[in-house]
Amino acid sequence: IQLARGKYVWIAEADDLADVHFLEECVRWAEQQPDTAFCYVGSQIIDEEGQVSAKDINHWGGRAKREANIFPGKAFAEHNLYWRNYTLNASGVLFRRTYALTLVQSPFLTMRYCGDWMFWFQMALQGSVVEIYRNLNFFRQHPAKVTVSSQAEGRGVNEDIQILAFMESQLPPLATYKKRLRRGLLYKKIGRKPMSHSSKIALFDRMDAELGSSRADYWLMVSNQLLRWIFPNLLTRGRDRLK
């Protein structure tokens, strides 16, 4: 990134594919705002043979009826990235070089599994974010890929905890219910990992120490999953996501 000379940077990962219109569309939309931090497109998974999966990994819902959306970056960080990393693949993103260069001391540089999530969060705090509702990126998924193996072994959860703590330190004060719901979702994620009981306990202890979380947050999340069908205005991850 430091050696790049252009206004925007695209990390063209050798194993992934891009539609011929990817850069054209990203630049067109990025140029509509003077402070665009990054612009990302929809992704589809392809296997080792190049076969495209029918699985929907974007979860746009009704948003897909539009061509694109431009969001204030801080709102995108609070309502979208706080819940999960919606920028599924770095090769499907075009980002502003000057903003990225402000992050040379960022904690994401020491992360192995979730550093991209931290990077996009910090980028969003600096300017607008563009979502383009077209699948212009093709994400090759190998069974032995680092992201797949780390999910299977739960090694990335420590970084999840670190990122959540960082986000909460950077965002405006969040509602207690929202923070507890988010922590409950992470509690659920840990519980489902194929890890030893002692490893899970260690992660729960770290959540308690760094986030002030407890098993009560898990049960709040469970009740939220049930009550959302009764109360249409109840906060959920999907409802908090910017439209």
Model-derived features: positions:
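Short, conserved alpha-helix that lines the donor NDP-sugar binding/gating region
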Residues: 1-2
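Membrane-interface aromatic/basic loop that binds lipid-linked glycans or pyrophosphate carriers
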Residues: 169-170, 189-243
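Short glycine/serine/threonine-enriched helix-capping/active-site loop
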Residues: 6, 38-43, 132-134, 139
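Conserved nucleotide-sugar donor-binding catalytic segment
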Residues: 60-156, 160
